[in-house]
């Protein structure tokens, strides 16, 4: 991923250059970097920062959350790491650390607000950015989902989950609902010159704005050929 991202940053090194770029060019350059929705949000966010904040990211979590594509975690991470403000950046790694440290047995996702609250109680007034990155690294390297390396953890003496003997079981998760099966029919239409018929998906929703082959709607019942072609 690194070389792809380096090329992306070389092409658009500033918020202003990214904001001025055509969306299609940004999406094309995002190939190999993950979900295209992230590129769309990044582009929209750059445009909002230029239009609303003269090209400079705001420092407050509230203003950051008002930008496209930025939620609680990203807003807190920017506030802490970029501006060294005391904000609790809670990703999946930090959720796991907090659940074990405080022995929170309520399942996810219901436990998320409580885990964020507990995480906020530990954020120092100084060097908040260093702490945010250290907490995430702790979850990624020591307080791992399986076989946590508790003997090396700097919080091992204060960990309630470890003291109670069930740290590795945490956090609990609510059983996932069974995924429904949906069926559809896709159409492959090719001109004599080899061009393939494509259409653009709606801007909102799954894979918004991406190109696809035409298809029917998706439903539980099978599609008879005659009905699909109607």
Regions found by a protein language model. Name each.
Residues 137-230:
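Intrinsically disordered, low-complexity, charged terminal extensions of DNA damage-control enzymes
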